[in-house]
Amino acid sequence: MSQPIKTIIKGTGRYVPPRVVTNTDLTRWMDTSDEWIRQRTGIEQRHWIPEEGGVGASDLGLEAAKIALGRAGWRPTDIDLIIFGTLSPDIFFPGPGCLLQQKLGLSETPALDIRQQCTAFLYGLAMADAFIRSGLYRRILFVGGEVHSTCLDISTRGRDIAVLFGDAAGAVCLEAVATDAPVGVLASALHAQGEFADILMMEAPTFREKPGISEEMIREGRHFPKMEGRSVFKHAVRRLPEVAREVLDKANLTVADIDMVIPHQANMRINQAFMKALGLPQEKLFSNINRYGNTTAASIPMACDDALEQKKIGPGSTVLFIGLGAGLTWGAVMYRFPG
C-alpha cells in the first residue's frame, strides 16, 4: 500500500522594508504616546515603505519568496502554484500573485489571490494542503504581503488604527511528502461570519457606488480602514479558543500536545487572553508584534519564520497556527514539523 501524502513546510522567509517607525515617531503626527500604544497593543515599532511610495505588496513578497525558496532548495521553476494573500494589492487588478509570478521570472505558473485578510495564511495553508493531498500540485509557494502605510489615516482622527499596522511579507514553501509519520498539516478548521463584516472594513474605493471614489468619501474618511476594536476583541476571545479545540479534536490531539502557538499578530492582549482561556502557559505563545506590528496576511508566516530562526520551534515541534480577522473570518491549523 502506498504511503499517504502529507504537506510539509520546506522553507520560510520574511522581509520588511528598511524604514522603522517607532511609537515615538508617531507622536509627531497624532496625539498619542509610546506608553499608550504599548499598553493596549504590545507594539513598539513597525516597518513602513519609504514616504515617497513606489513599493507594492508583490515587491515585498518577492524578497520574502527569494529567502524561502533558498531555504527550501527550490528554483522558481520548481513552483507548481503561487497563492498570494493580501488586503493591499499593488493595483486593483490583476492581483499580486500574477505580478509576483512575473517578478520570479516565471511564464505560465498558475497564481491564485485570496482576500482573507488576517486569516489569509490559515485559509491558504488549508487550500494548499487540499491541493497537495489531491495530487493536483506538488510544490506550492504561499506569500502574504502587505503595504498598509499608504492607506492609513496618520492623524489623531485615525490613531486607533494607524498605530497598529506595518508593511511586510512572509513566504512559505509547501511540499508533498509521502510518509506514514504524523507530520505536516495534521488538521485545519476555517470559519466565516459575514454579518459582522462592518466591524472591520475599508469601504472605498468601491464598485457599488458611482463614482467609485469621491471628494465626499475622502472627506468622510471612507477610504481609510475602520474597526470597532471592542467588538473585534470580544469575537476573538470567544472564537479563538473554540476553533483551537475544534482543530485539536480533528487532529486527535489535546492542548497538552501543543509545543508552540503561533497566532496572527494583531494585539498582545487578545493573544494572552486566548492562551489563558486554553489553559496554556504564556511561554508557549510566540509573539513578534512588538517589532513588526500587525502585518495582516504576512503576520503568521513571518512569525513562523522568526520562531524557526530563534529556535523556538524545530524538528518534531507541534504548532498551532491560529487567527481571526476581517470578514469576520477565523481559523486554525495544526502542524507538526518532521524530525
Residue ranges and their predicted role:
Residues R133-A168:
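Flexible, glycine-rich active-site loops centered on histidine and acidic residues
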Residues I43-H47, D78-I83, Q102-R115, C151-R157, ...:
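Glycine/charged-rich beta-loop-alpha catalytic/anionic-binding loops adjacent to active sites
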Residues S58, L62-A65, L69, S88-P89, ...:
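Claisen-condensing/thiolase-fold acyl-transfer catalytic domains that form or cleave C-C bonds
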Residues R71-S107:
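Anion-binding (especially nucleotide phosphate/pyrophosphate-binding) glycine-rich loop
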Residues M30-Q39, I91-G105, F142-C151, P211-M217, ...:
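Acidic-glycine-rich active-site phosphate/pyrophosphate-binding loop
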Residues M1-G53, T156-K234, R238, E242, ...:
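Condensing-enzyme catalytic core mediating Claisen C-C bond formation in acyl metabolism
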Residues T77-G85, V255-H264:
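Short glycine-rich phosphate-binding loop at a beta-alpha junction
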